[in-house]
Amino acid sequence: MGKLPMKEAALVYLDRSGGLQKFMDDCKYYNDSKQSYAVYRFSILINPCDVVELDAELGNHILHHPLKAAQVFQSVCFVAVKTLSLIGKLQTETQINIVLKLTHLPSLPSYSLDLCEFPLNYASQRFYMMQGIVIAMTTVTKYTQGARFLCSDEVCPFSKGFQYIRVHVPGATESATVRNDFLCRLCSSSLQEDRKFRVLGDKQIIEIITTKVLHAFQGDPKNQPFRFQSLSVFLRDELVNKMKIGNEYKIIGIPVCVKTSQTALCVEANSITPYTAKVPSGISDNFRCLLSLTSSSCWRFTAILANVFASHIVPLGTYNLLKLCLLMSLVQTRDCSSERENCLDILVITSDTLLVDRLLNFSMNLVSRGIRHPVCTEVFPTVSRDKYGTGAVSIQAGSALLARGGVCFIGDLTSHKKDKLEQLQSALESRSVTVFIPGKKFGDDFDQQMTFPIQCSFWSFVDMDSSSRRNVQKASTLIGQMDCSLIPANLAEAFGLLVNCKESSPCHPLLPTVQHTLKKAVDPKGPPYLASKQFTTEDFEKLLAFAKNLNVEFSLEAERMIHGYYLASRRIRTDSIHGSKLSANALKYLVSLSEAHARLNLRNKVLREDVLIAALLFEISLTLKYGATAFCVAPNALFPFELYDEDYLEQRDLYLTQCQQQLQHFIATCGPGTAVLSSDE
C-alpha cells in the first residue's frame, strides 16, 4: 500500500474519532492569534486498536514507525489547512508539527519494556509500555520545540520563507534541533537561525524504578546482594509536572540512547497513566469463617487477629498490644491515588530490639509500600545537579516519599542525628517536608523551595535498656509515666502511638519467647503453631489489602463519644503554665484509630466500640508520656487475659464493657458540655 491510501485512512480516522474537529478548533486559535508562528503544533489522540481495525498498515506505522506515521498525519493536516483555508499565514508543510498521543498499547509482551530484563531494546525507535515508581525528578527547564532557519546567501530563494523548519522529534537532543552547521540544500551555504521565531517548550526529567526492586528497600531476609538500575524518562510540554515523587505510573514512550559521561538508556514519554492496584474481592475462607463465629462481639475478631498474627516471628499470644497497633496502622495505609491521609505513626519502647525489629520488618512487608530505611541513604528528599547537563536541579525521593501510601520503618530512633530527628518531628507534625534549593549553588538567580506531602506512616523503636543508656535514665515521679529522656519530648509527642514492650510490660513474657526460639531452632521451616497453618501470611496480606480499601463513616454515637473523650482529656491535661499537653493532631489520631479498628473488623461504620479501643490505646500512650489521670487505664487494658479459649474472650468482652462505662463516666464528669457540638469542634 502506498502513502495515498494511508493518508485517506488517516483522514477517515480523524473524522470518526473527533480529531478533525479538534484540529479545526486549534487552527482557529492559531488563525485568530496576532502572533506570528513558524511552527504550528497539533496534538492528535490515537487509539491504536481503532486505527488497526480501520487500516492495518497505518496502525502498523503508528505502533512500529511513529515518526513516519506522524509524517502521514502531517501531510493530511496540511492539505486540510490549505483546502479549508484554516490558517492564512501557513506556507509550507514543514511548519506543521504533529504529535501523536497514544491512549494505550496492545497487551502483548513485545510492547512491554521490563526494566529488570536484559538486553533492553532501545534501537527500534518505537513505542513501549513500562511501569515504575518515581524516585527522582528535576525542576522544569526549557527546550527548543521548533526553530526557523534561513539561507545566509541573500541571493538564494531560501533566504526567505519557511523552507527550513526544524522541530524536536522523540529522542533528539537540543543540538539536533538547533546548531550552526546546517547547510542549504540548494546552494550549500550555511543556514542561520531566525531567533525571533524560535519556539520553546517545557522539559522535565524523572527517574523511575520497577516495582519489582522494592524488595531492595524492604530488608532482604536472605541477605543476598542485589542490584537495580533506574530509568530516566523525559517529560515534555503538557506532560510536565504530571508525575509525583513516590507515585506509580504506566508510561508509553520511545526508548532512546543518550550519551553523557556514559551511555544511558532513557525514554521519551508519550503518555502517562497513574497505576491503580487491584483491590481484592474478599478475604480467605478461614478469616471469613472466623468473622462469622465472632460476629456477636465487636472486639473478638481483632483480638484473635492480634493473637495469631506473626506467630512465626513471636510466640502466639505475645506482643498482642503491639501487633494490634501494627495491624491498625497497616489498614490505614492506602493506594497512592487515594486522598485519605489518616496515617498512624508508632514508636515502640523495647528492651528486645532484635525481636521487635523482626516483627516490624515482617509487618511492613505485608503492604506493597513498606520501606525499610537504609542507613546509608536519606529519610527525606535531597537535591543534586542533574546528570544530563540540562542545568536543572534533581530532587531525590528519600525513604519517606518512596513509602508513599505505605509504611516507612526507620529503625532505632536514637541512631539518627539531632538534625535528622528535628526534620522528622517537623514532618510528623505538618505531614509535609520542604526542600530548599539554593540559587547560587545551582546557577540560578533566585532561591527556590518545594514542599512535598508526607503520606506514609512512620515506625520506629527505642532501646531503653542498653548498657550505654541505663545510667542516664531517671526515675519517674508520676504514676504510669515512662522515662523518655533519650529522645526529645516533642518528638515522642509527634508520634501518634507510644507502645511499651519492655520486660516489665505485659507484652514481654520471657518463657514463651524462649520456648518459641528453641522450637524454631529445632524445626526452622515447620509452622510453630496450628494457627500458623490456619492463618497464613498470604491470608493476612489479602485481609489487609481488602480492609484498607473499605470506606468507613462515623455513627452519631461514635462521633459524640470521640469528641467527648477528646474534650475531657484535653481539659484534664491542661494547666495554667504549660497549657494543654495534647498535641494539635490528637483528635486526628483518635479518628484514625477508630477508623482503623472498624476497618480491621471489616465494617463500613465506626461504632462506639471502635472509639473505646481508640481511646484506650491513646490513653495508654498518654499515660506513658505524662502519667495517669482520672481516666486511669491499665497498661494491659486491651488484653487483660491470655486468649486461650472462648471463655477468656467472654471475660475480655465483660472487661471492655466496664471500660466503656468508665469512659462514659469520664466524659460526663470532665467533658464540658459534649451533648451538642459545633462543626468546628
Swiss-Prot record:
Domain of life the protein comes from: Eukaryota
Record Gene3D superfamilies: P-loop containing nucleotide triphosphate hydrolases (3.40.50.300)
GO biological process: double-strand break repair involved in meiotic recombination; double-strand break repair via break-induced replication; late meiotic recombination nodule assembly; meiotic recombination nodule assembly; oogenesis; spermatogenesis; synaptonemal complex assembly
GO MF terms, alphabetically ordered: ATP binding; DNA binding
Pfam families membership: MCM_lid
Keyword tags: DNA damage, DNA repair, Meiosis, Phosphoprotein
Signal peptide extent: none
Name this polypeptide is given: Minichromosome maintenance domain-containing protein 2
